[in-house]
């Protein structure tokens, strides 16, 4: 299947089949894929928590508003975090990069614009990994739903990943055959190519 065909097939699943579970091998493959995610200057300011423990997953589901039902039906929830401490990020992540990348890009174009800009830039890197992850899921024949509608404060408390703040989560599983959001039932709604693509 071509990547274009995968893109046409992929959608934010709303109703999962609770009888179909992701295998341990698939979960391990997804872990490896996420470690290979791209980021600006290879900064990697992230952590990914793979939640398969039913009790923990249930606690997180209760803090996920309209996404609670989806989380309870799948056996994998992945939480994407960003590093909180800028100084720790610079010491741990940037110190191992080529000096030219740091002095030629990070310091004059990111850090020079203030701490809020650094924080926003770090979060942007985590979102890059999300697109990569969703594409990988589609390639593996898995259905996934990215979710920003979660209680970030409670997610942080439940997961206890010191030094990292949760940004969003993704359910991964298999869609129910009758999922109302499936493109076969609800055609994809996207702007026309000419509205979003410029060719110069």
Would you name each region that the model predicts?
Residues 1-20, 26, 33:
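N-terminal targeting/leader regions
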Residues 5-7, 11-15, 167-200:
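C-terminal helix-cap and adjacent tail motif
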Residues 22, 55, 150-151:
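Short beta->alpha linker loops
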Residues 34-36, 78, 100-101, 106-158, ...:
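Small-aliphatic-rich amphipathic alpha-helix that forms the alpha element of a beta-alpha
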Residues 38-42:
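Glycine-rich phosphate/pyrophosphate-binding beta-alpha loops
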Residues 43-46, 142, 167:
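Short secondary-structure junction motifs
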Residues 49-124:
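Glycine/small-residue-rich phosphate/adenosyl-binding loop
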Residues 68-71, 77-80, 161-181:
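A glycine-rich helix N-cap at a beta->alpha junction
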